[in-house]
Structures are given as structure tokens and as C-alpha cells.
């Protein structure tokens, strides 16, 4: 068993527009408070579920006051809160109340048993990297964003292919005609990048992956770069090209705009139950080894 820091103030975050989430959040809050922890709620979550009796805080206030944030929702909720809390190094615990649950790894049915043990110090910790990106137009930055999973440059559904000029560390890599290009973290390698035939990167691998989306030339393949690489993607052709960050914020691009992407100085601590295995997550979520030869193999 790995014993870590015991927490005092716990922030609860939920996907506020999800039907049926109020009861499990209230139940978890009561369970945690009964064990002597101070419980606060993220403000939008508190408003949506009517969490009377608990302080309601903005993400910035959570970062300044809470020792840990427990997120009940899907991967998107976890990504959004991770980006907002990244500057504060607030650890995150993810409870899956969505569909896939790659990064919300605790089943909701187990939360009342597992979460209190983790808050008492029984957990495994890992750091997840983020990307920071900026859009440069006519030599001036016009937009900045963080991305937990990926930065995606792509065409709209009704326009032709995008033409992109890609450079790494100031050196020309290639011109590419495609539906777009994904720049992904190891965490994001199991998201959109995976569906575009990109490789899976272990979360502790120091890398950034570039994955073309439906490239015109079959020789345009994914490539893994060192995570200190500085990537520049210039729009040199195409109509209605845009860029999105974790599929949660979007910006329209113009000809000759450049998207500059690099690893963020921020990392986000993820906390897992003792015995957590990334390989078990892959096996379960991607349906690997559906007919294991033994129970021992299945539990590894």
C-alpha cells in the first residue's frame, strides 16, 4: 500500500447538466464530511444540484483553498477542470459518471468505499502533461489556450482539404494536404488521435504525437516528438479551417495564421486507487484480451 499526503479540504465537481448526478454527489459529500474532511463544491455544480450547507467556490478559489478535487462525471468534465486547476497543482480524483472513462477511473458504484481511503492517504500519484498553444496572426498573438488532450487543426465539414506547413523547433518538417492535424499529449493519445490511427503513448512517456487526419498522401504518418519540441502549424491553403482545444473551445483561422504548440509548464496530478494499472484501463476500455486464459491474467 502506498501512503501519501492526507488531505483536509475536498472540492467536489460534477457535470452539472447530467440527469441524476445530484444524489450521488450529495451522498459522496455526506460520506466525506462524516469522516472529518471539509467539503466545498464547485460553484456551477452547487447551483445545479442545490448543495445547501457547503461553500460554493469558483475554480480559482478551489485552487487556492482545496487540497484535492474529486470530479464526478466523464472524461470531458475531468479535462475541463484539469485545465482550470493546472496553475494551482491541485490533485484530481476522477469518478466515472460518463461513458468511456479513460481518465475517470473509479466506478461510481465504488466511490463511497474508495474515495475516503484515498483522502486518508492511500493512493498512487502521477503527473499528466498539458499543451499550451497560441494563434499568431500578422505577427501578433491573438489567442492562447491550454489543452489536456490535444490541439486539433481541421477543416469544416463542407470545405476542401486544408493545406498546412509544419515546422518543429524552427526547422521545416513538411507541407501536408489533409482534413487536419492532431497534436496530442500522451493522455490525448487515446482520444481523437487514436481514432485517426495514432499510437498509444503511456502517460509517463515524455512525448508529443502528431497525427494527420485523412492525409492526401498515404506516406504522411503519425510521428512522436520529444516533449520539449516547439511545433508551428501554418495555414497555407484551404477554406473554413479552425482549431480546437480538447474539443471544448474553438477558434476560426485565416490564411497564413500560425498555431504554435509546446508543452505547458503546468502539469496536473492525477490520484488513483492503490493497485491502479494503466494497462488494465486499456484492456477494459479497448476490449483487449476479452477471453483471458486465467483469472490471474484478467486481474493484472
UniProtKB/Swiss-Prot annotation:
Keywords: ATP-binding, Cytoplasm, Kinase, NAD, NADP, Nucleotide-binding, Transferase
Enzyme Commission no: 2.7.1.23
Binding site for NAD(+): 75-76, 149-150, 177, 179, 190-195, 214, 248
Catalytic residue list: 75 (proton acceptor)
GO cellular component assignments: cytoplasm
Molecular function terms from GO: ATP binding; metal ion binding; NAD binding; NAD+ kinase activity
Enzyme class: transferase
Main location: cytoplasm
Reactions this protein catalyses: NAD(+) + ATP = ADP + NADP(+) + H(+)
Names of the cofactor(s): a divalent metal cation
Coiled coil: none
Alphabetical list of InterPro entries matching this protein: ATP-NAD_kinase_N, ATP-NAD_kinase_PpnK-typ_C, NAD/diacylglycerol_kinase_sf, NADK
Xref: Pfam families: NAD_kinase, NAD_kinase_C
Subcellular location: Cytoplasm
Gene Ontology biological-process annotations: NAD metabolic process; NADP biosynthetic process
Top-rank lineage group of the source organism: Bacteria
Similarity comment: family membership: Belongs to the NAD kinase family.
Function in brief: Involved in the regulation of the intracellular balance of NAD and NADP, and is a key enzyme in the biosynthesis of NADP. Catalyzes specifically the phosphorylation on 2'-hydroxyl of the adenosine moiety of NAD to yield NADP.
HAMAP family: NAD_kinase
Matching PANTHER family: NAD KINASE (PTHR20275:SF0)
Protein name per UniProt: NAD kinase
Organism, scientific name: Burkholderia pseudomallei (strain K96243)
